[in-house]
């Protein structure tokens, strides 16, 4: 996730007048609509697991959780409709149960999966907690919230405050709550301020929008299930150092490099150059909301078209400009953009893009309390909001990467192979960023020879109702920018070869 750029956009944020119900923010509205379409989905749950090692006082933990719930209005919020519009209602007081279960170490993953289940948005609080007792001195705290009340930053706020409350510290009362932001966002003045941002996004996404055509293992189902899995892999310290040098020389970020690498990868497996890749921003552009729990994260649609003769370094510079411009206009709600573009509704895919790139700081912070250590515990949710999501982070061991994929569309074997391709591209451009995009290969020489041997002597059936040049023209339409012929070190794409053939044909006619 890219850091939010500083902005003065929230300078008029103030406590809202007390009401029975409050409007939803733009991001909340989209979450509400998605939940109404499928109330059994867990794709917008936000589970987290904390490993607690040492002397744990369960009664104190239970009390601290309920103090946290009553400290933040967002944790006491429910969602319903009034006059045909979704609204949020805040209850004055709420409580959650902390269910305690005994479990073996090997049972933890299954217990975590069983813990994650759909939320009913009409009933507050939209947070659950459970405790797995693995041993006397080892517990797993399971927390789950709905995305409509929180984001990744919120989760970090909750964990730190929970630890402080457990220690018995008195925390200052929040001056502002998320409903204050939602009311502010719905004011007429803010809608007017959004017009400049709106014009930027409508300009970037003007004309015919590209639809990424990925090679699928399975037929796309009519309704997206959001079921997924993840392949985790790493770039070693050598590649990480080379990338650090590249970042310093180009003034770019790891997010920009991964965006560019992912674009090249997607272009090579799809044959398309004009691609929209999603990204996210924390959306907290003012100090007043830095420690406010709620749904601030915004989605950005990064559209980029690679040139036929570009090098990776040139495309990286383009990605830098694309990302910086997008961050300048990040306040415009993605939900409003989707509505303005009037995209056709398709339950089988996401609007605007089906792939995403993210970068986040790894959550490895340990909290040391008296006789108790709290640290993150990695658990996989088993969902994928998009066809593919490339995630990355830098740490002391290099660069950590993960490819999340929709299991309705791709096999594990394909995802693992594509992870190797992404890593190969990253290693290649780290070593030499000035390579032409056309020279970057997903496969190594051994794999090339294996493919050639596998196809040697094989024939494929061809349509008998079309001429050779018609079949070639159709191939050009599908793979215009892919290499078609290589001879004596020179390469021509299908588009270039077709242009040469047409020139020769005009001479002969």
Predicted regions and their residues:
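Adenylate-forming
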Residues: 29-39, 47-56, 65-67, 81, ...
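A Lys-centered signature of the CheY-like receiver
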Residues: 151
């Amino acid at each position: 996730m890219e850091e939010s750029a500083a902005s003065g956009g929230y300078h008029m944020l103030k406590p809202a007048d007390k009401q029975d119900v409050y409007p939803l923010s733009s991001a909340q509205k989209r979450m509400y609509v998605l939940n109404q379409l499928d109330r059994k989905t867990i794709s917008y749950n936000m589970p987290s697991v904390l490993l607690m090692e040492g002397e744990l006082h369960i009664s104190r933990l239970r009390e601290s959780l309920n103090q946290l719930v009553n400290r933040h209005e967002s944790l006491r919020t429910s969602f319903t409709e009034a006059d045909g519009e979704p609204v949020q209602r805040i209850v004055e007081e709420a409580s959650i149960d902390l269910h305690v279960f005994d479990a073996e170490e090997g049972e933890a993953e299954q217990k975590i999966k069983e813990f994650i289940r759909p939320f009913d948005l009409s009933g507050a609080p939209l947070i659950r907690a459970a405790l797995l007792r693995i041993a006397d001195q080892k517990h797993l705290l399971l927390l789950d919230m709905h995305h409509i009340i929180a984001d990744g930053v919120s989760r970090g706020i909750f964990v730190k405050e929970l630890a402080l409350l457990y220690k018995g510290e008195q925390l200052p009362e929040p001056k502002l709550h998320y409903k204050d932001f939602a009311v502010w966002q719905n004011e007429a003045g803010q809608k007017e301020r959004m017009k400049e941002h709106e014009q930027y996004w409508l300009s970037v996404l003007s004309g015919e929008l590209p639809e990424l055509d990925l090679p699928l293992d399975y037929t796309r189902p009519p309704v997206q299930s959001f079921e997924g899995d993840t392949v985790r892999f790493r770039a070693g310290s050598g590649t990480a150092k080379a990338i650090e040098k590249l970042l310093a020389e180009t003034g770019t970020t790891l997010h920009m490099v991964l965006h560019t690498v992912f674009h090249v990868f997607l272009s090579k497996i799809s044959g398309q150059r004009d691609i929209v890749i999603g990204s996210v921003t924390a959306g907290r552009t003012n100090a007043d909301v830095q420690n406010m729990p709620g749904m601030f994260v915004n989605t950005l649609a990064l559209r980029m078209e690679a040139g036929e003769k570009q090098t990776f370094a040139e495309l990286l510079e383009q990605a830098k400009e694309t990302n910086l411009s997008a961050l300048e206009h990040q306040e415009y709600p993605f939900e409003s953009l989707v509505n303005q573009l009037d995209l056709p509704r398709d339950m089988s895919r996401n609007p605007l893009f089906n792939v995403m790139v993210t970068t986040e700081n790894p959550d490895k912070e340990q909290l040391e309390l008296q006789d108790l250590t709290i640290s993150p515990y990695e658990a996989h949710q088993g969902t994928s909001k998009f066809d593919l999501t490339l995630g990355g982070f830098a740490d002391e061991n290099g660069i950590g990467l993960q490819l999340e994929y929709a299991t309705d569309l791709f096999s594990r074997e394909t995802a693992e192979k594509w992870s190797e391709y992404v890593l190969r591209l990253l290693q290649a451009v780290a070593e030499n960023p000035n390579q032409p995009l056309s020279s970057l290969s997903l496969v190594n020489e051994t794999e090339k020879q294996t493919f050639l041997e596998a196809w040697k002597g094989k024939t494929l059936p061809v349509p008998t109702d079309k001429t050779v040049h018609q079949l070639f023209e159709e191939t050009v339409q599908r793979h215009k920018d892919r290499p078609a012929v290589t001879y004596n070190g020179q390469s021509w794409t299908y588009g270039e070869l077709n242009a040469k053939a047409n020139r020769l044909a005009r001479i002969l006619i």
